[in-house]
Amino acid sequence: MLGLRPPLLALVGLLSLGCVLSQECTKFKVSSCRECIESGPGCTWCQKLNFTGPGDPDSIRCDTRPQLLMRGCAADDIMDPTSLAETQEDHNGGQKQLSPQKVTLYLRPGQAAAFNVTFRRAKGYPIDLYYLMDLSYSMLDDLRNVKKLGGDLLRALNEITESGRIGFGSFVDKTVLPFVNTHPDKLRNPCPNKEKECQPPFAFRHVLKLTNNSNQFQTEVGKQLISGNLDAPEGGLDAMMQVAACPEEIGWRNVTRLLVFATDDGFHFAGDGKLGAILTPNDGRCHLEDNLYKRSNEFDYPSVGQLAHKLAENNIQPIFAVTSRMVKTYEKLTEIIPKSAVGELSEDSSNVVHLIKNAYNKLSSRVFLDHNALPDTLKVTYDSFCSNGVTHRNQPRGDCDGVQINVPITFQVKVTATECIQEQSFVIRALGFTDIVTVQVLPQCECRCRDQSRDRSLCHGKGFLECGICRCDTGYIGKNCECQTQGRSSQELEGSCRKDNNSIICSGLGDCVCGQCLCHTSDVPGKLIYGQYCECDTINCERYNGQVCGGPGRGLCFCGKCRCHPGFEGSACQCERTTEGCLNPRRVECSGRGRCRCNVCECHSGYQLPLCQECPGCPSPCGKYISCAECLKFEKGPFGKNCSAACPGLQLSNNPVKGRTCKERDSEGCWVAYTLEQQDGMDRYLIYVDESRECVAGPNIAAIVGGTVAGIVLIGILLLVIWKALIHLSDLREYRRFEKEKLKSQWNNDNPLFKSATTTVMNPKFAES
């Protein structure tokens, strides 16, 4: 399997990576060497005979190399396949910029294989250049100049390469509203100047196939007429997609492919087609008919990502020749489209030849190393060691700038498989160049153990040995094929080793031997696996102070629960069986109002730690025990002579006590003062009752009634006196006013009410005579 050694740099990187990954081996239910190798890059398998003891699982054979060596497995018995890379050069000759041309990888899951790819930029590499021009009306001056540039463009290419070809295509936009005016007259002549001869709008027209004939270029371009549309953005991405998707129609060779995109405005992209009721996404296929993109009104514009993928797939490098106001817009576009460049185009395109030369030099001096699409099970990273001293590590693609002619640069490619893969291959290429590296990937998952299949005695003659373990014949099972199934299926035997249908065989911690679980021995010190289904062990219990069940001195673990030794208790035997910390000064546990657990009181509701003596939030007992105080001291009240039964928790004291002072009314309405001193326990008090009661005499009913009647009468008399006084004052005031008016009046002999019956009238004419 091994051929040429991989380069030293790749080998060093691979070994250093392997050292890191080999420090651990995470495994689960491993029963073969292949399953062990698939568990991780740090796992190795011991094929030594009798390496496992009675009850040991086969998974004991799978561990890190240091662990297996420590357990007595010889180095020759350890199976540890590694990922390898074999390189093969192409000896067919020809100018190759990438080497090697073929690499074969043998990949172990989780372990990378590394190899080097060298790129050497060649001088005079063949070039195909396709000039794609915007023919909207604003590009009128540019079209005039481009018609004269055929010879200049080809001469510029010949300065760079000995084999250059040029082609030409043009675009405007989709021929539906709102992109163009769909009035019949405007469709025939979309230009604002009616006297100007214009061609109808179109999405994309392939004018000239790639050729080295500059006269033909000049002739065909000279026939082109300007056109027009409505909105500012153009349908340039539509045209670029067709140029990339139609290699045969365009005439692309397998050489450096340049696409010059000349415009003075922006571009429509995916989703804009909805404005014209075009809902079908762009399919990225060639739809040229008679050199026209006639189905442009059926498909939406392509997305930028879709176009970038198509350009990279066909190894086309776009050069955006745009006017000054659009430079920033297209610079943003080049960040998404790899291996692309932007040049500032003069208003009349007079500098296009110089622009193309500069852009080509910029593109060819930067190298991107990338690969085609891969399944999720393969991961590829690149380390770039550029000639200018710059290094990029662990990148999704290789990237070097400032690459000079005939100066080699190196990329280290690391490929990792996440699982055992099927045989497959992928291609690595330098974007914009035609050379490729074919990488064939093979799985490295099998163990090449010593062939002992003929020695059947080690398996009781009922099987053969494979990598240290027996593979039994039909009808026999067991570690050494010692168990005969006797017609029972393996499923039936395994069913006896399951707790229920949803559980795994022997809880995953034992082997099912002849229908019975043989529990594994554990690598963990002190762990014993047992039980009918190996469901129990001596370690999976609660811990205290970092030890199972508080340590051997406190208790032992039995099937998930701690059994504590005498003197200890608790779910993890964390508590000592003593109540010293719970005793009050009277040596009563938690004052009779709680429970002592782990030498700490757990008080009844409301009572406070540490000894459950106080209950700040509890209701006052005064009102509850007034009847008891009355019967204990005075032998009165509702309890009467049945006081001892009604008040069992109270004890009468003849001497004053300390505690809660109460003052309540008894059944006779007298105030009784007493003091309650709480004793140990619930509702237990020592009570001292004051002998004197404050009894209030009954009310004098006659005095109350007489006083009430007298008060009402007096109030009535007082109101009458006040009313009479007010009437008198009002009459007095009226009389005095009458007296004043009488003094002011003057009387004569004439009756002021009499009117004379005689009326005298003077004749005015009498005086004139």
Curated annotation (Swiss-Prot):
UniProt motif (Cell attachment site) ranges: 397-399
GO biological process, one term: cell-cell adhesion
Main location (coarse class): membrane
Tissue spec: Leukocytes. Expressed in neutrophils (at protein level).
Binding site for Ca(2+) 2: D173, N229, D231, P233, E234
InterPro entries reported in the protein's UniProt record: Integrin_b-2_sf, Integrin_beta_N, Integrin_bsu, Integrin_bsu_cyt_dom, Integrin_bsu_tail, Integrin_bsu_tail_dom_sf, Integrin_bsu_VWA, Integrin_dom_sf
Record's keyword terms, sorted: Calcium, Cell adhesion, Cell membrane, Disease variant, Disulfide bond, EGF-like domain, Glycoprotein, Integrin, Magnesium, Membrane, Metal-binding, Phagocytosis, Phosphoprotein, Pyrrolidone carboxylic acid, Receptor, Repeat, Signal, Transmembrane, Transmembrane helix
Binding-site residues, Ca(2+) 1: S138, D141, D142, D264, E347
Extracellular side: 23-700
MF terms in GO: amyloid-beta binding; cell adhesion molecule binding; complement component C3b binding; heat shock protein binding; ICAM-3 receptor activity; integrin binding; metal ion binding; protein kinase binding
Residue ranges annotated as Cytoplasmic topological domain: 724-769
Top-level taxonomic group: Eukaryota
Span of domain PSI: 24-74
Location in or out of the cell: Cell membrane; Membrane raft
Signal peptide bounds: 1-22
Phosphothreonine: residues bearing it: T758, T759, T760
Residues annotated with Pyrrolidone carboxylic acid modification: Q23
Subunit structure: Heterodimer of an alpha and a beta subunit. The ITGB2 beta subunit associates with the ITGAL, ITGAM, ITGAX or ITGAD alpha subunits. Found in a complex with CD177 and ITGAM/CD11b. Interacts with FGR. Interacts with COPS5 and RANBP9. Interacts with FLNA (via filamin repeats 4, 9, 12, 17, 19, 21, and 23). Interacts with THBD.
Family per record: Belongs to the integrin beta chain family.
Disease: Leukocyte adhesion deficiency 1: LAD1 patients have recurrent bacterial infections and their leukocytes are deficient in a wide range of adhesion-dependent functions.
Record's comment describing the protein's domains: The VWFA domain (or beta I domain) contains three cation-binding sites: the ligand-associated metal ion-binding site (LIMBS or SyMBS), the metal ion-dependent adhesion site (MIDAS), and the adjacent MIDAS site (ADMIDAS). This domain is also part of the ligand-binding site.
PANTHER family, per the entry: INTEGRIN BETA SUBUNIT, INTEGRIN BETA-2
Protein name: Integrin beta-2
UniProt organism field: Homo sapiens
Organismal lineage: Eukaryota, Metazoa, Chordata, Craniata, Vertebrata
